[in-house]
């Protein structure tokens, strides 16, 4: 049982550290938690506690992730930090830890490195909306010109991947000094500057209930004398009795009216995000609706078959494929509640994809699925997960 009640007085925001190995992501995570705990309450975290990240499973993929909480004057943050590069790739692609914003940690002594670039690219592909930069290890750089040069390089890199490089907050500091209790500009002051940037630069995310109505169809029943009932968990928004809704995906889009909302055998006048409900649909036949479609606010989402995605292919040890796959590989793509077959086109410079790789692919599905950029999917072969992905760009 939870020991204390979660106080929902402050808005909640999800963030995480990204960046090259050994640039100080975990040290910074510990420093933020420690400095903010002293200022606003909460639990300080030691480096070792964060570094020993527990294993979790997301979509059948094992990921090591550490979760840390902290508060500022205005907000409550949940922060994720991963020990290894592969964990970041998996985490970002599966959306196991959705980030409202990321803190890119870059060592001032080394400047941007290959994983700095790769994490920015991943953030772009998977739809992380905001990046703040913490230029770490500034205590090791005496030359102000060198610092300026590194800052310029980071801004250029962000702009290259369509983040607003020129307007991105860059905080200079030393996570190590801050963690050791240094009260100076590069220590505690830098952490407070970072907290301020988090509060001001990352907007408060829209709550699921404020989104436009969407519910993936899980099951369909026919109730004699009442009509067709569709069950599922409302992903976002609200549906009220009497509202017009659309059935999208797999078949041509049709409109219908919700004439009843039922939860735990009780009739309600509305259902909202997070509710497991049955919706009664007027004049809709049982065979008109199937698992894998979605119910939504009319016009809010369209069905598509052609898209680019960023995918992670499970390694053999993770229960994935034992062999590589090539161009025109045809697995099943599992979106929300159903599998749809599709063919994969690899980038020109990529002859094959090995188990354990991550890669950008182009996919053509044999049936349209209600999708938008940022939608997660699993790649399966005969019901077994062999990969995970996210829709980066819709092409049709």
Curated annotation (Swiss-Prot):
Where are the residues of the annotated region G5?
Answer: 174-176
One GO molecular-function entry: GTP binding
What reaction is this protein's catalytic activity? GTP + H2O = GDP + phosphate + H(+)
List, alphabetically, the Pfam families matched. Answer: GTP_EFTU, GTP_EFTU_D2, GTP_EFTU_D3
The record's GO CC annotations read:
cytoplasm
Provide the residue positions that the database annotates as binding Mg(2+): 26
In which compartments does the protein localize? Cytoplasm
InterPro entries registered for this protein in UniProt: EF-Tu_GTP-bd, EF-Tu_GTPase, EFTu-like_2, EFTU_2, G_TR_CS, P-loop_NTPase, Small_GTP-bd, T_Tr_GTP-bd_dom
Q: Which UniProt keywords apply?
A: Cytoplasm, Elongation factor, GTP-binding, Hydrolase, Magnesium, Metal-binding, Nucleotide-binding, Protein biosynthesis
Signal peptide start and end residues: none
Domain (tr-type G): give its ranges.
10-206
Query: Which principal EC class is assigned to this enzyme?
Result: hydrolase
Region G2: list its residue ranges.
Answer: 60-64
Q: Where is this region: G3?
A: 81-84
> Under which EC number(s) is this enzyme classified?
3.6.5.3
Annotated region G1: the residues are 19-26
Chain positions recorded as GTP binding sites? 19-26, 81-85, 136-139
Region called G4, residue ranges: 136-139
Query: At the top level of its lineage, which domain of life is listed?
Result: Bacteria
Q: What does this protein do?
A: GTP hydrolase that promotes the GTP-dependent binding of aminoacyl-tRNA to the A-site of ribosomes during protein biosynthesis.
Q: How does it assemble?
A: Monomer.
The UniProt family comment states:
Belongs to the TRAFAC class translation factor GTPase superfamily. Classic translation factor GTPase family. EF-Tu/EF-1A subfamily.
- Mind telling me which NCBIfam families this protein's record contains? EF-Tu, PRK00049.1, PRK12735.1, PRK12736.1, small_GTP
Protein name as annotated: Elongation factor Tu
* Natural source organism: Cupriavidus necator (strain ATCC 17699 / DSM 428 / KCTC 22496 / NCIMB 10442 / H16 / Stanier 337)
Designated gene of the protein: tuf1
């Amino acid at each position: 049982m939870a020991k204390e009640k979660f106080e929902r007085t402050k808005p909640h925001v999800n963030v995480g550290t990204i960046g090259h190995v050994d640039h100080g992501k975990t040290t910074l995570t510990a420093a933020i938690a420690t400095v903010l705990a002293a200022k606003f309450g909460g639990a300080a975290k030691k480096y070792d506690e964060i570094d020993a990240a527990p294993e979790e499973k997301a979509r059948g993929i094992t990921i090591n992730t550490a979760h840390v909480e902290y508060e500022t004057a205005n907000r409550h943050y949940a922060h994720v930090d991963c020990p290894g590069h592969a964990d970041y790739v998996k985490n970002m692609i599966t959306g196991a830890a959705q980030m409202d914003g990321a803190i890119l940690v870059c060592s001032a002594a080394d400047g941007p490195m290959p994983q700095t670039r790769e994490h920015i690219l991943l953030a772009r592909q998977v739809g992380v909306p905001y990046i703040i930069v913490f230029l770490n290890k500034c205590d090791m750089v005496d030359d102000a010109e060198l610092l300026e040069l590194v800052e310029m390089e980071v801004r250029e890199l962000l702009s290259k991947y369509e983040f607003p490089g020129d307007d991105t907050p860059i905080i200079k500091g030393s996570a190590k000094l801050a963690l050791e209790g240094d009260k100076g500009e590069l220590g505690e002051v830098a952490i407070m500057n970072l907290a301020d940037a988090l509060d001001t630069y990352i907007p408060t995310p829209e709550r699921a209930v404020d989104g436009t109505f969407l519910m993936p169809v899980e099951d369909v029943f026919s109730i004699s004398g009442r009509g067709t009932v569709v069950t599922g968990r409302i992903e976002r928004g609200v549906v009220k009795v009497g509202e017009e809704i659309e059935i999208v995906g797999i078949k041509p889009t049709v409109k219908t009216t919700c004439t009843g909302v039922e939860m735990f055998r009780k009739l309600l006048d509305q259902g909202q995000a997070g509710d497991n409900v049955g919706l009664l649909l007027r004049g809709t036949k049982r065979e008109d609706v199937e698992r894998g479609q979605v119910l939504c606010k009319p016009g809010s989402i369209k069905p598509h078959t052609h898209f680019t995605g960023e995918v992670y292919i499970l390694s053999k040890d993770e229960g994935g494929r034992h062999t590589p796959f090539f161009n025109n590989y045809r697995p099943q793509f599992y979106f929300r509640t159903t599998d749809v077959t599709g063919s994969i086109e690899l980038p020109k410079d990529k002859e094959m994809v090995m188990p354990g790789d991550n890669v950008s692919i182009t996919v053509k599905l044999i049936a349209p699925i209600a999708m938008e950029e940022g939608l997660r999917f699993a790649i399966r072969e005969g019901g077994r997960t062999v990969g995970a992905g996210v829709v980066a760009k819709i092409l049709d």
